[in-house]
């Protein structure tokens, strides 16, 4: 694995290898808290968009591996404001670092970065396109909290149009046998047809507007992403259309996930019920990103 740009680029066996390595990283975290696999190495985090969990978990992962971090979170302090191209930025920074993690508002920015980098590039989210490291930590959460990925029944609820985490996860799940997916969203926020076409025939799909979480293993809630709407009035038409409460969950044997941040789509009272795993899901970002960084670096020096 040279870069991690899209879930389309990696197969089932590579996914399972990353999940196995993530389990080893979690064990290290629990036993010692750190290791020296990437001692003396540098990760560059280039965040052209705001981030809390992804950026901080990448930085934590690199430091837990014994490495160091450079980067930026505010492009107003960079040469981007002078008109420097993304390609030139990557060519320069890949000379300073051993790995690069980039988040960018433009679809395809991570791919372009990988084409201009001397070191492995990790897509930390490119517009509404892909978010592969989130997908891998989602799969790890499912494996750890549900116990299986094959024959999984999962309901995605909310913004399925702009939600890059949903796009990536659906594509990854299509590699596993017996998966059934419910896509629950308003018409304005349906899953893009190209994603549907990509996974059609590989998994059982059903689309609906009304919430139906009976007979599922996982409920995957998503935020309605105001920042992706061209017309803010369209956002307010769908804002708050789905809100998960304790009453919805009841005694169901289900795992509730959310890529976070949350706005109003999950009541805060849900946080304290045993089915809620979204904060555990967020924690898993550290061992999973440790595994990704370690494996990418090892492959780059072979």
Swiss-Prot record:
Record keywords, A-Z: Pyrimidine biosynthesis, Transferase
Substrates-to-products reaction catalysed: carbamoyl phosphate + L-aspartate = N-carbamoyl-L-aspartate + phosphate + H(+)
Residues engaged in binding carbamoyl phosphate: 53-54, 103, 131, 134, 260-261
Pathway of action: Pyrimidine metabolism; UMP biosynthesis via de novo pathway; (S)-dihydroorotate from bicarbonate: step 2/3
EC number: 2.1.3.2
GO molecular function, one term: aspartate carbamoyltransferase activity
Record flagged with keyword Transferase: yes
Entry binding sites for L-aspartate: 82, 164, 223
Pfam families referenced in this protein's UniProt entry, alphabetically: OTCace, OTCace_N
One BP term from GO: 'de novo' pyrimidine nucleobase biosynthetic process
Function: Catalyzes the condensation of carbamoyl phosphate and aspartate to form carbamoyl aspartate and inorganic phosphate, the committed step in the de novo pyrimidine nucleotide biosynthesis pathway.
Subunit structure comment from the entry: Heterooligomer of catalytic and regulatory chains.
Family designation: Belongs to the aspartate/ornithine carbamoyltransferase superfamily. ATCase family.
Protein name: Aspartate carbamoyltransferase catalytic subunit
Protein species of origin: Methanococcus maripaludis (strain DSM 14266 / JCM 13030 / NBRC 101832 / S2 / LL)
């Amino acid at each position: 694995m040279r870069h991690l740009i899209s879930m389309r680029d990696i197969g089932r066996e590579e996914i399972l290898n990353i999940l196995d390595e993530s389990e080893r990283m979690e064990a290290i975290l629990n036993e010692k808290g750190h290791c020296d696999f990437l001692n003396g190495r540098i990760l560059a985090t280039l965040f052209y968009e705001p981030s809390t969990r992804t950026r901080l978990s990448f930085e934590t992962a690199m430091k837990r591996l014994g490495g160091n971090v450079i980067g930026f979170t505010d492009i107003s302090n960079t040469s981007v404001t002078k008109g420097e191209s993304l390609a030139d930025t990557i060519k320069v920074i890949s000379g300073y670092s051993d790995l690069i993690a980039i988040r960018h508002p433009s679809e395809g920015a991570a791919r372009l970065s990988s084409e201009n980098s001397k070191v492995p590039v990790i897509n930390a989210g490119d517009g509404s396109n892909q978010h592969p490291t989130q997908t891998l930590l989602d799969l790890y959460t499912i494996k750890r909290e549900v116990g299986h990925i094959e024959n999984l029944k999962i309901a995605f609820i909310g913004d399925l149009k702009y939600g890059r985490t949903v796009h990536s996860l659906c594509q990854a799940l299509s590699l596993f046998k017996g998966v059934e997916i419910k896509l629950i969203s308003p018409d304005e926020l349906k899953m893009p047809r190209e994603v549907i076409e990509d996974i059609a025939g590989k998994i059982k799909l059903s689309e609906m507007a009304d919430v139906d979480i009976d007979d599922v293993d996982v409920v995957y809630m998503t935020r309605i992403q105001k920042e992706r709407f061209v017309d803010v009035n369209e956002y307010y038409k769908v804002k708050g259309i789905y809100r998960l409460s304790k009453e919805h969950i009841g005694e169901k044997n289900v795992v509730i996930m959310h890529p976070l941040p949350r706005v109003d789509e999950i009541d805060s009272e849900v946080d304290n019920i045993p089915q809620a795993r979204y904060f555990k899901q967020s924690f898993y970002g550290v061992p999973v990103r440790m595994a990704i960084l370690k494996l990418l670096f090892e492959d780059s020096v072979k």
